[in-house]
């Protein structure tokens, strides 16, 4: 079964961007969103103001708090205040995040990032525009609810756009049609930035900025000669894959990423 929570994925991406930006770069390449030459996505440290205390905002807060990053929430619905714990009341304020004076009062001038994650795209874009006027250097992040608004978000030059519906499609499609790639993505999250940085360099130097990812199942139908060789308990080295089928003098450019055994 494929169970996907887009808000958990988004918050995990933010966590990776904070702790290991080169793993974030590899993820974007594997999901065919960017190539490996894309600029490294660096998330600054400092005060983050999150507008919208819903499920997505709370998931993002968990990861920011884990990285010891100061967070302030702005929530427009005062009814939510009745449900807040004593701890939550320390970092959630109630008001209009699109109000210039209220943003200043909340600390927008000292913030390094503003995150608009309400369920209304017009509201999110308006909040970011107001914040950007007050603090031109601030990093902007937004939730895009409707794919039809994609042009508006790109025109607004939002630094990071998170679209739950698009993330769901990418994740499910990858898991169904590229299962080994999906496993590899889950594994690299546990690696560090130095490891990921070296892999990015190797891929770009040995192949190109956008290598093709190929999944091969070794069996009698797909790879008969390799299968027979292995079944006879003979050793087989990966370097054989570097030899071109068409000309023994030519070399294939490849880097093995993952080997999964059935047992």
Question: Which stretches of residues belong to each language-model region?
Answer:
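Cytosolic regulatory domains of K+ homeostasis systems
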Residues: 2-83, 159-263
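Phosphate-bearing ligand-interacting subdomains
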Residues: 1-18, 86-180
């Amino acid at each position: 079964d494929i169970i996907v929570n887009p808000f958990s994925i988004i918050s995990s991406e933010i966590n990776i961007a904070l702790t290991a930006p080169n793993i974030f770069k590899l993820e974007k390449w594997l999901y065919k969103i960017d190539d490996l030459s894309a600029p490294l996505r660096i998330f600054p440290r400092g005060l983050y103001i999150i507008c919208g205390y819903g499920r997505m905002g709370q998931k993002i807060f968990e990861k920011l708090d884990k990285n010891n990053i100061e967070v302030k929430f702005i929530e427009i619905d005062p009814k939510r205040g009745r449900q807040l714990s004593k701890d939550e009341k320390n970092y959630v304020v109630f008001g209009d995040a699109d109000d210039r004076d209220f943003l200043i009062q909340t600390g927008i001038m000292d913030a390094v990032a503003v995150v608009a994650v309400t369920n209304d795209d017009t509201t999110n874009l308006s909040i970011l525009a107001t914040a950007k006027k007050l603090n031109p250097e601030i990093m902007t992040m937004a939730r895009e609810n409707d794919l039809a608004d994609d042009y508006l978000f790109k025109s607004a030059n939002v630094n990071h756009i998170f679209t739950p519906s698009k993330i769901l499609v990418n994740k499910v499609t990858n898991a169904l049609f590229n299962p080994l790639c999906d496993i590899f993505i889950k594994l690299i999250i546990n690696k560090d930035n130095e490891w990921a940085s070296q892999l990015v360099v190797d891929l770009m130097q040995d192949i190109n900025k956008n290598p093709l990812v190929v999944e091969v199942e070794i069996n009698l139908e797909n790879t008969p000669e390799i299968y027979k060789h292995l079944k006879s308990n003979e050793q087989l080295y990966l370097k054989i894959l570097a030899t071109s089928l068409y000309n023994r003098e030519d070399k294939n450019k490849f880097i093995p990423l993952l080997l999964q055994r059935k047992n």
